[in-house]
Amino acid sequence: MLTRRRLLTAALAVPAAGAVTLAMPRRAMAAEPEIFSAGGLAIRGTDPVAYFDGNGPVAGSSEHSLMWKGTTWNFASAANRDAFEADPEQYAPIFGGYCAYAASLGYLAPTSPDAWTVYEGKLYLNANLRARELWLEDVPGNIAKGLANWPGILG
């Protein structure tokens, strides 16, 4: 089992030159928003529907945006916005767009749109590419742990 100490050791072991280190997750001390947003934008303005077409992250536009669960979601096209609006649970990232790996450990961490996985038709985001590597070591197990932890994480 990965402990906080091992997580910190792994993060510090990554070479500093050009490497992306694992952001230290944190336990929620007070109620956190259900959806992670940076600057009021879900997925940092990235189109959530675009992850499902095989192209990976695509920047959304404020021209094609909507409000869902108190957060603004941007889309690359009106068609993607309409698809999301028709079935947001299909396209919205699991764990509210917070880092899925951190959720599996019982913590919250912000995410990067470039650290993502679509698994069994669901979108999972991670804090960075190193967290994604750790997440991919046991996706089904990490999902199970994250789902078990999730009700208590937001506070």
Model-derived features: where do they sit?
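N-terminal secretory signal peptides and thylakoid transit peptides that target proteins
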Residues: 1-18
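C-terminal segment of N-terminal export signals and the immediately downstream linker at the start
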Residues: 22-47, 54-56, 115, 154-155
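A charge-rich, low-complexity, intrinsically flexible signal that marks solvent-exposed coils, linkers
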Residues: 60, 87, 93, 105-114
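Short acidic-hydrophobic surface loop/beta-edge motif
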Residues: 64-68, 115-119
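Mid-length scaffold segments of soluble, non-membrane domains
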Residues: 73-86, 90-92, 96-98
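Hydrophobic core segments of beta-strands in well-ordered, beta-rich domains
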Residues: 74-75, 124-127
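Compact alpha-helical subdomains of small soluble proteins
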Residues: 118-123, 130
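C-terminal partner/receptor-binding element of secreted or periplasmic proteins
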Residues: 136-155
